């Protein structure tokens, strides 16, 4: 016998957890669509030369390649050493770049797309790291230009999604890479590659700590003078406490830098100010976002606004949603300039962390809302008719197809997480009613048959707001 098991790095859920996961997906999708984003799906595998155009190094080492057995045999016979023709996608950004470049002549710009699909990475097997996982992305792509106003709207989407998910108080940390790079210029760090390297180190502050990052910036090939490093670390420690405080800190940044401040710094401050102003207009409460000059995002293609979202009471979970603005999404695939802004929610990892922290307990029981008991074989037609009426009334209903002991049927409903159990014996049928047991409240009551579906619907709606 072969031992049944899954490969490491995948998240396989039992039905109750899968229901909770699916409901989170539904909330994310619903809010993406509410803001006018259109669904896109791309193939799970892409041509290797297309997928790997922008990657290299660590990314390429994590890619899963796809090869048919026939192609594999032919390659072995011929001694071919080149990469297989196909590879599984490792994120949704590169497929989006290919998609927009391929269809730019028919797409309407700005193109607002959402994509919720699995991606694959050859991660080292360890707790909390996944080789197959869901990403839930949105992006707004412009042609030649894209207004900074979309950056504010994206933050409003983040707020809408996590408000409805209801997984705890959260906060979006907001920054702009132009502010960071402009400040680095003011400290004498003017080389573009060195700036990117410094930003990657700043992005590691939470994981490595200030002392470790300071030592790295002063030595290890960076060679930045200690005084400038102290200025940089002091600058990135800036946090706002309110909307007004954020605007005041931006004003102070320009005043402190003087009339000769670098253009990039001034541009970044202006963009942040506009985003903050519009976020306020969009109705995002000021406690839901903060200005944080340490947010850099490690990916080099971000050029402006950057976001990171975290749960206030569970900081150990880390970022639950991140993203930012980029200047040219598809420069490897088209000569058109396609700037954009977007975010990604890594739902598989988020769900695993929430479950691990005990935050998913009781979130979902079953997608089945009612079960009809089969009293005996003679009442099968009646049980099926009750179930039919419930389904017509919008109640997800299961029927017991075998006349087992009633106690056994109740045990099944309880174990399956079904809230309502409906039964109709001879007495109930004679009086035109059904008996309903609410397993959640541990109450039993009778309902006229014609009112059964509407009554259960009211009970379910009330449970949503409790």
From Swiss-Prot:
Gene Ontology terms for molecular function: ATP binding; histidine-tRNA ligase activity
Enzymatic reactions: tRNA(His) + L-histidine + ATP = L-histidyl-tRNA(His) + AMP + diphosphate + H(+)
E.C. number(s) listed in UniProt: 6.1.1.21
Matches recorded under SUPFAM superfamilies: Class II aaRS ABD-related, Class II aaRS and biotin synthetases
Subcellular location: Cytoplasm
Ubl conjugation among keywords: no
Protein name: Histidine--tRNA ligase
Lineage: Bacteria, Pseudomonadati, Pseudomonadota, Gammaproteobacteria, Lysobacterales
């Amino acid at each position: 016998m072969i031992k049944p098991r899954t490969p490491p790095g995948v998240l396989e859920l039992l039905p109750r957890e899968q229901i909770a996961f699916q409901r989170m997906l539904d909330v994310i999708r619903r809010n993406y669509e509410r803001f006018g984003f259109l669904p896109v799906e791309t193939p799970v595998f892409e041509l290797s030369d297309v997928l790997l155009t922008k990657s290299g190094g660590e990314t390429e080492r994590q890619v899963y390649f796809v090869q048919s057995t026939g192609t594999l045999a032919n390659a072995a016979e011929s001694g071919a050493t080149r990469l297989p023709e196909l590879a599984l996608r490792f994120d949704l950004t590169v497929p989006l770049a290919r998609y927009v470049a391929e269809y730019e002549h028919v797409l309407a710009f700005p193109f607002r797309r959402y994509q919720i699909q699995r991606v694959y990475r050859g991660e080292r097997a360890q707790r909390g790291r996944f080789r197959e996982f869901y990403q839930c992305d949105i992006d707004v792509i412009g042609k030649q230009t894209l207004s900074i106003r979309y950056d504010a709207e994206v933050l409003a989407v983040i707020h809408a999604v996590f408000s409805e998910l209801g997984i705890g108080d959260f906060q979006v940390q907001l920054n702009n890479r132009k502010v960071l790079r402009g400040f680095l210029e003011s400290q004498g760090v003017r080389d573009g590659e060195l700036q990117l390297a410094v930003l990657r180190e700043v992005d590691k502050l939470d994981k490595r700590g200030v002392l470790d990052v300071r030592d790295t910036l002063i030595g290890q090939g960076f060679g930045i003078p200690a005084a400038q490093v102290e200025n940089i670390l002091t600058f990135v420690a800036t946090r706002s406490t309110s909307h007004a405080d954020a605007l005041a800190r931006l004003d102070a940044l320009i005043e402190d830098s003087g009339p000769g401040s670098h253009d990039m710094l001034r541009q970044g401050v202006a963009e942040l100010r506009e985003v903050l102003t519009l976020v306020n207009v969009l109705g995002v409460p000021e406690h839901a976002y903060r200005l944080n000059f340490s947010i850099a995002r490690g990916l080099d293609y971000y050029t402006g606004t950057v976001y990171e979202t975290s749960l206030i009471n569970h900081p150990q979970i880390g970022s639950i949603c991140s993203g930012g603005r980029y200047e040219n999404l598809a420069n490897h695939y088209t000569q058109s300039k396609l700037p954009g802004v977007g975010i990604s929610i890594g739902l598989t990892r988020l769900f695993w962390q929430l479950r691990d922290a005990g935050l998913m307990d009781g979130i979902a029981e079953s997608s089945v809302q009612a079960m009809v008991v089969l009293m005996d074989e003679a009442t099968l037609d009646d049980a099926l008719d009750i179930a039919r009426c419930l389904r017509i009334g919008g109640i997800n209903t299961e029927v017991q197809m075998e006349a087992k002991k009633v106690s056994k049927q109740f045990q099944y409903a309880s174990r399956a997480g079904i809230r309502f159990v409906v039964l109709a014996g001879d007495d109930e049928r004679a009086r035109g009613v059904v008996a309903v047991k609410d397993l959640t409240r541990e109450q039993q009551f009778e309902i006229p048959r014609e009112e059964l579906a509407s009554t259960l619907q009211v009970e379910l709606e009330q449970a949503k707001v409790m």
